[in-house]
Amino acid sequence: MSKKWTRNTAAMAAILSALCLSTNALATSEQAVTDENQTTTQQEGMRFEPRNEKFAEAHAEQYKSWKATQESEEIEDALEGDPNMVVLWAGYGFSKDYNKARGHFYAITDVRETLRTGGPTDDKSGPMPMACWSCKSPDVARVIDDRGEDGYFEGKWARLGAEINNAIGCSDCHNTGSEEFAKGGPALQMSRPYAERAMETIGKKFEDQSRFDQQAQVCGQCHVEYYFTGPKKSVKFPWDKGTSVDDMEVYYDEIGFKDWTHGVSKAPMLKAQHPGYETWREGIHGKNNVTCIDCHMPKVQNEDGTVFTDHKVGNPFDRFEDTCAQCHTQTKAALKSVVATRKASVLEMKLRAEKQIIAAHFEAKAAWDAGATEAEMEPILMDIRHAQWRWDYAIASHGVHMHAPEVALRILGTALDKAGDARAKVIRLLATKGITEEIQIPDISTKVKAQQALGMDMNKMNAEKDEFLKTIVPEWDKQADAREAKY
């Protein structure tokens, strides 16, 4: 079943998928009356309390609005909406399954259910590393605090499935054990040490920043580009040379990193994650000190007049007077028209880039089949790598048509250029092999047809996932309940 949200809403929810609690008590600290006697029920001595319900009484409005993210219940299959992506990610997990993001409430459910994490049969099997939990739960911060980063990252995704069971919540972004938080203040914190190091790399040490920068940094713990490095597949942000798409491309090339080898062209590929922080910095909102919460987590009043930060992340147009109208003088209809135009422009460029990159993948395959050498193919494959990296960077930055449309259009334009370069080179190479006719692309008009064209056994994958959900996950939940009963 397709989600009934508008596509604008889905995009906005995705870009804020980890922003929701970044400023949980921000408005409370500014405008709501704080209670000197107000306390939480956090376990004494526990630095990261992962159980969000423990804050339901002391931070009732924030908790209630956070819990309302469960209203984004229905799932929208992004591969059905754009089957091109199946081929673009051939050989990688995203070709199996890619859904639009839902609210924070579903973070654990969704990562368990996606085909990308496979159907592990024990704590040592499955396709993905532990790092795939890293932005899904405050339990991650708890485990890192208990065991260190090496103790967290080591092994497969299923290794600590019984430890990571609470959805994205309060302790991801707030120091919930602090006196400030207990009294209703925001107590923002960087709960992921690898993210804190990355911010220092770009000269933004958390404690030295303004509240504005800290708000964005807390969100940027998760809504960023990152990759897995070293034998333990630890998370690292590729910011050593800067935070632009060009800077990160150079960084990846210099260290010889690839996420996977493409299943059609054999190109060494990069998979962009969700670089919302980076594109926001480049866009008009970031440059004007408008943060994520200003648009997606506005300050609102409850019935008794208490002002708090609304944690039900969604489309700013749903709360126009509390969001857009705080800065813009245009009517809601006028602004919606502007956003729709920008979104259409980005979508058009996205689809144009996809068409060219897909053609390049199949033409590269034809060249390999015709006997091309690695030396002949290297410059072609690098152009394909760079073209798709740029395409992916633009489209993975959810809501970029709103946050930084000019950035998205520029990047997609360079993706088109690089795909064109790849195709020109491979067509010349094919000619030297005696191939001058157009290379045919199989029918990829639907998700099912595209997966069939790649020879993917979806029945097997789905059966393995179903068995995992039926047998392994209930055991995880039992173990988690037993552990938390001892807190």
UniProtKB/Swiss-Prot annotation:
GO terms for cellular component: outer membrane-bounded periplasmic space. Substrate binds at residues 226, 274. Its main location: periplasm. One of its GO terms (molecular function) is iron ion binding. Its cofactor is Ca(2+); heme c. Heme c 4 binds at residues 292, 295-296, 403. It comes from the Bacteria. Pathway: Nitrogen metabolism; nitrate reduction (assimilation). This is Cytochrome c-552. It comes from Photobacterium profundum (strain SS9). The lineage of its organism: Bacteria, Pseudomonadati, Pseudomonadota, Gammaproteobacteria, Vibrionales. The gene is nrfA.
